[in-house]
Amino acid sequence: MSTIAKDQTQINEKIRAKELRLIGQDGEQIGVKSKREALEMAERVDLDLVVVAPNAKPPVARIMDYGKYKFEQQKKEKEMKKKQKVINVKELRLSPTIEEHDFQTKLKNGRKFLSKGDKCKVSIRFRGRAITHKEIGQRVLEKFADECKDIATVEQKPKMEGRQMFIMLAPINEK
């Protein structure tokens, strides 16, 4: 059972390979050297020997400042996280017999979610015998989608799932 963390970079004495393809501090390729020779070269210039491609044959190692390298990696990771946008799905529950004022309140909430960039799942739960009038629920969902068409697109048309009917709305991207 391996207990190596995903960020366990092989540096200096922790390098397991006997031979390494060595790259100098300014990026020039030095060639294939033994681990001992490579470590001596790194120590001469007061830098670390870091394996950058452990799966290559032989592994590729570079003479560099490990602290600086680690900092750059963390910086890149942070930038990648910033670029990722987490899309939340907000759900609004309606009933097929919803009154106009209640509908407008739910619509206002839905528009708020969509304007923030979240997807919106609008669902209608049919209770008892109301399931026999699915067309009423479908009209309510279509009305909701129609009221939001200026800020959202229908990602999934009204669909029945058990005793629920739902529609998915996604915000329109302004790029």
UniProtKB/Swiss-Prot annotation:
The keyword Amino-acid biosynthesis does not apply. It holds the Pfam family IF3_C. One of its GO terms (cellular component) is membrane. The keyword Cytoplasm applies. GO terms for biological process: ribosome disassembly. Keywords: Cytoplasm, Initiation factor, Protein biosynthesis. InterPro entries: T_IF-3_C_sf, T_IF-3_N_sf, Translation_initiation_fac3_CS, Translation_initiation_fac_3, Translation_initiation_fac_3_C, Translation_initiation_fac_3_N. Its main location: cytoplasm. It is found in: Cytoplasm. One of its GO terms (molecular function) is translation initiation factor activity. It comes from the Bacteria. Monomer. IF-3 binds to the 30S ribosomal subunit and shifts the equilibrium between 70S ribosomes and their 50S and 30S subunits in favor of the free subunits, thus enhancing the availability of 30S subunits on which protein synthesis initiation begins. Belongs to the IF-3 family. This is Translation initiation factor IF-3. It comes from Staphylococcus epidermidis (strain ATCC 35984 / DSM 28319 / BCRC 17069 / CCUG 31568 / BM 3577 / RP62A). The lineage of its organism: Bacteria, Bacillati, Bacillota, Bacilli, Bacillales. The gene is infC.
